[in-house]
Amino acid sequence: MTSVLNRVRTSVLEIAYEQSGSQDGVPVLLMHGFPYDPRTYDLVVPLLVAAGCRAIVPYLRGYGPTRFLAAETPRSGQQAALGNDLKELIDALGVRRPVLAGYDWGGRAACVVAALWPDKVRGLVSANGYNIQDIAGSTKPAPPELEHRLWYQYYFRSCRVDGQSPRVLQAAVAIMVTELAVR
């Protein structure tokens, strides 16, 4: 399956994207997650094209050939930025009511667009978490059983992590996981 690498400008980015299938097919935007790229969908795109769809797989901000238009633009992975990138991509491509599919950061972007601009979306497939976050609610403590399951998130944000090499971090996480497993 051959896809073509294209680029389109939005207000903030020059978004690189791969496209396969007929221009007349139902548009399906496949959004990758962190830290992956469009290769995630290499086995999916041929199935969509065979079903008559137009598969569009962009590189998210900060990935591959997608570039910020201005050096002074803040680099952000916030859900509002990711959602706006996708909304502007839909507008720039002129696709009408695509199906949005994504996981991780890409799933979050798809959920933001579906929630804020439902008239722009034919359907939504979101997998592997990171759906829309309640920013105000995230400032409150989670229930203890949830905090127990997400312990590693606090560790990653601790001062013990700053400046450490990936090997040191991997070893520290392995030790902590082992300690939890043998309890």
Predicted regions and their residues:
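Secondary-structure boundary/capping motif
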Residues: 3-11, 38, 44, 54, ...
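Conserved phosphate-coordination/catalytic loops
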Residues: 11, 35, 80
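Flexible "cap/lid" subdomain of the alpha/beta-hydrolase fold that forms the substrate-access gate
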Residues: 14-15, 27, 63-101, 105-183
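Alpha/beta-hydrolase fold catalytic core
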Residues: 1-28, 50-54, 72, 95
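Conserved HGGG/HGGXW glycine-rich cap/lid loop of the alpha/beta-hydrolase fold
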Residues: 18-68, 89
